[in-house]
């Protein structure tokens, strides 16, 4: 099974300039493809996030969308009464996010930053963070730094929702931890156990399970983790 529609594969086949640098890769994708052609760009917010809010397990607060892309989920969350900051490595994606926020007449702050780099300007700023299909873009050697940065951005007892591709997902060849996509990017597919080990030093785990999530062309198997920052 391949997660990309045949017409989309034709579009990306002619792309050039995608290298090993994630910022360059993402800027190229957002420059060269329409939003309709970008596989992770979905307009409707994910059910797991909607359910968390509609059940009132999460109330409006200061929130950060990690790897916000073109801003769909950040703008939706702002419309639900949250004070939202969207962070992404791609300045091209954030240009689109700002346009969307203006079109929807909501305020979001958008910040260009490497989430494995310097996030001091965002320290102790948020009560809720989420990353949706972001962590599988990071290899194991960078994940500890990333999670430490997320914790640094959050206030004590803040909540954190992370959803990334599971090693049980049949897409992109269907096996192996590292899998190449038609875009030229490489993704890392996780197990529940390794995510438990990743998050436990800094977070209490509320929920950890494998779920099916909506994709643009086919569904995916993903690991959902809902966490609370430990109070040290």
Q: Predicted regions span which residues?
A:
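Class I (Rossmann-like) S-adenosyl-L-methionine-dependent methyltransferase catalytic domain
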Residues: 1-62, 70-122, 138-149, 159-232
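Conserved S-adenosyl-L-methionine
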Residues: 67
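A conserved beta-strand element that flanks and buttresses the S-adenosyl-L-methionine
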Residues: 130
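Short catalytic micro-motifs in class I SAM-dependent methyltransferases
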Residues: 133-137
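Short, conserved loop/helix-junction motifs that constitute active-site signature segments
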Residues: 152
């Amino acid at each position: 099974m391949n997660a990309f529609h045949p017409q989309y594969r034709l579009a990306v086949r002619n792309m050039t300039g995608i290298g090993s640098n994630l910022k360059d890769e993402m800027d190229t994708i957002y420059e060269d493809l329409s939003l309709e052609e970008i596989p992770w760009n979905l307009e409707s917010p994910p059910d797991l996030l909607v359910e968390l809010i509609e059940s009132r397990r999460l109330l409006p607060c200061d929130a950060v969308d990690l790897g916000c892309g073109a801003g769909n989920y950040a703008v939706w969350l702002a419309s639900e009464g949250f004070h939202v900051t969207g962070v992404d490595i791609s300045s091209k994606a954030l240009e689109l996010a700002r346009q969307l926020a203006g079109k929807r007449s909501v305020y979001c702050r958008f910040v260009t930053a490497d989430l494995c780099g310097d996030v001091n300007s965002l320290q102790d700023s948020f009560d809720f963070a989420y990353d949706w299909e972001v962590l599988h873009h990071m290899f194991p050697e960078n994940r500890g730094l990333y999670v430490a940065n997320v914790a640094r951005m959050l206030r004590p007892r803040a909540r954190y929702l992370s959803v990334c591709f599971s090693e049980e997902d049949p897409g992109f060849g269907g096996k192996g931890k590292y899998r190449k996509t038609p875009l030229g990017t490489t993704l890392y597919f996780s197990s529940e156990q390794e995510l438990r080990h990743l998050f436990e030093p800094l977070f209490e785990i509320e929920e950890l399970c494998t779920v099916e999530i909506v994709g643009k062309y086919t569904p995916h198997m993903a690991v959902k983790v809902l966490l609370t920052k430990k109070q040290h």
